[in-house]
Structure formats: C-alpha cells, structure tokens
C-alpha cells in the first residue's frame, strides 16, 4: 500500500475539524493572455475546466479594474453558496476560500486586499488559498501577505507546472524555472505556507524527466504539492496542435499509477500531497478519458502495492495513446 502525507489528514489535524476548500472566481484575468507577458495563454489552459458551477466567470466581459471593484460582494455570495452546498452533509465544517481562477494576485494591491479581506469576513471561513503565477507576486504584496498570515491560515499556490525551461517555453508559460524557485524561497522566508502545482506529461517530459524533477522539489521549501496528469481539453491551443500532442504523455490510469508509485516514495516525507489528478468536465475533455472521479483514482493508487526495490518500471508508450484523438 502506498503511504504519503495526505492533505485531508494534515488540515484536519491543524484545525481539529473537517475543512473544505471552496473555489471562487474573483474576476481576475491573466497577464499571459492580455499581452502584459504574452497572448493566448498556456497551451493547455481552459479556465472553464476547473471552475465550479457556483463560480461566476466574469473574465473578458468587463475591464480588469471593473471586475475587481465588483467582486467583493460576489466573493461573499460564492462562499455562502458553497457553504450551503457542503454544510448539508457536514454542518460543523469550516472553510478555506480558494482563489482559483486565473491569476489571483494580478491587480492593484489595494483591490487585492479588499478581495482577500472580503473572503475572510464570511462566517466559518478560517483561511484563504491563493493560486497565482510565480511571476505575479511583488515584494509589496508579499509584505501584506506576510502580515495576513499572522492573522489567518494562508497558502500561496504557485503554478510552477514544470522546472524544465525548455518545456516552459513550449507550453508558452511566460516565466522561467528560476522565477518559480525564487518566489518559493521568498514566500517561505516570510513564514507563508507554500504549495507548488505541477503537471505531469507535458510535451517532451517522460518518466525520466518527471522523476528527475523530484530532486528539485525536495530541495525547495515546498509544504504542499498538487499534481495532475496532462489533459487535452476543448478551447485550448493544444487541441489544435497534433505536433505538440505527439510529444505529450497522455497516461492511462494504470500508467499514471505506475509512475506515482515510484514518484511518491522519492518525495520528502514532510511534503503534504493535496491531489494527484484533475477531472475536467466530460463535455470539454478530449483526452485521456479515464471515466474515473478523482477520489476513485486515489483509492486505486492507495491500494496499489509498493514496488519492490530494484524494480525497473516498464517504459511508457511514447505517444500515450494520442492517435485515438484524431481517429
């Protein structure tokens, strides 16, 4: 059986109760879409694939300034809607406001403060988690976040995606691995909990490269790790780039488990793993189509026997079953 430091257990031990993250869309945009850093965004990104139904996606309909000014009440509404949904089963549950959609530090600092404080004003919200790009957190904002972390539970979730600079260029990420490393270290130095998000199976990254990067993860002050398999979804650049898809590893569940049973034991045992997979809506997902919910995959992984030492894992297929996309 695979053992690891589970996020659910870690957060429950920290607060002494069941805690649920509620995803919210605060109306942010992305500097890799609007021309500040780049245009078009990352090749795999379709924000609709991870937005819950209770989130209101305002991106693109009004200006960035208007979105942020309108969002404080909207944030409270989304949190109350999320609370209503989860409290039916767990009335005593506490909540973390998860700023998930797009780049949640991309805006005027005073506007950002209003949004974060609005979330914390909601009853039974005991902390916030802020997802953002490694190149979108200023020293001024870190000063505020450091102060905020003394008042509430705060996690900064950085979309690192990979530590390979060649891959970062291919996926049009718009930042370097050095940028990711520096912000992780700087955030940790402020006493703020750091979460790193990585995608496994990006163009050119097979088993060997994925496992190589575990050493980089272990060398950095990362508290929480979020992993997920690469998925090709509608409305993305990657959907229309069969040349890049051919360089990706589109795992089957069995192949992904086989990778993770080697990946997990290599991690520092103090690193908390929050998730292993992403589950895009069926109507948007092109490949790979697993037909599994996240918890179902995790159950399969946890039941998998630990591989014996010295075992050489079978090689992954070079195209991960990509051809079926175009049949």
Give short role names for the model-derived ranges.
Residues 49-82, 86-109, 124-137, 153-179, ...:
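Core AdoMet radical
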Residues 86-88, 116-123, 143-153, 185-189, ...:
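Acidic (Asp/Glu)-rich catalytic clusters
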Residues 2-9, 13-20, 53, 224, ...:
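Auxiliary Fe-S-binding modules of radical SAM enzymes
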Residues 118-125, 212-227, 297-313:
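Structural recognition of alpha->loop->beta junctions
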Residues 109-117, 138-147, 210:
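Distinct, well-ordered alpha-helical segments
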Residues 178-238, 254-277:
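Conserved C-terminal portion of the radical SAM core fold
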Residues 15-74:
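Canonical Radical SAM [4Fe-4S] cluster-binding loop centered on the CxxxCxxC motif
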Residues 20-24, 95-97, 128-130, 154-158, ...:
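Hydrophobic faces of well-ordered beta-strands that scaffold small-molecule active sites
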């Amino acid at each position: 059986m695979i053992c690891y430091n589970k996020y659910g257990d870690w957060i429950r031990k920290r607060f002494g109760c069941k805690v649920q993250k509620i995803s919210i869309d605060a109306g942010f945009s992305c500097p890799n879409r609007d021309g500040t850093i780049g245009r078009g965004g990352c090749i795999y990104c379709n924000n609709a694939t991870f937005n819950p139904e209770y989130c209101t996606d305002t991106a693109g309909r009004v200006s960035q300034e208007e979105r942020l000014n309108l969002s404080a009440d909207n944030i409270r509404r989304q949190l109350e809607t999320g609370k209503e949904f989860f409290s039916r089963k767990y009335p005593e549950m506490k909540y973390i406001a998860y700023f998930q959609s797009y780049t949640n530090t991309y805006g005027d600092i005073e506007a950002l403060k209003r949004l974060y404080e609005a979330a914390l004003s909601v009853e039974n919200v005991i902390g916030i988690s802020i997802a953002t790009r490694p190149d979108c957190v200023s020293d001024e904002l870190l000063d505020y976040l450091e102060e905020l972390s003394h008042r509430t539970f705060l996690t900064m979730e950085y979309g690192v995606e990979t530590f390979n600079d060649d891959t970062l260029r291919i996926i049009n990420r718009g930042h370097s691995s050095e940028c990711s490393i520096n912000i992780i270290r700087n955030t940790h130095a402020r006493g703020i909990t750091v979460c790193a998000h990585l995608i496994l199976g990006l163009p050119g990254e097979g088993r060997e490269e994925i496992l190589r990067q575990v050493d980089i993860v272990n060398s950095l002050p990362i508290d929480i790790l979020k992993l997920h398999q690469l998925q090709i979804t509608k409305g993305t650049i990657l959907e229309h780039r069969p040349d890049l898809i051919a360089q990706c590893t589109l795992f089957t569940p069995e192949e992904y488990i086989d990778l993770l049973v080697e990946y997990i034991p290599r991690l520092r045992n103090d690193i908390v793993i929050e998730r292993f997979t992403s589950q895009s809506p069926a109507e948007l997902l092109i490949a790979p189509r697993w037909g599994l919910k996240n918890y179902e995959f995790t159950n399969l992984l946890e039941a998998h026997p630990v591989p014996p030492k010295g075992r050489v894992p079978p090689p992954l297929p070079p195209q991960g079953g990509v051809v079926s996309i175009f049949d």
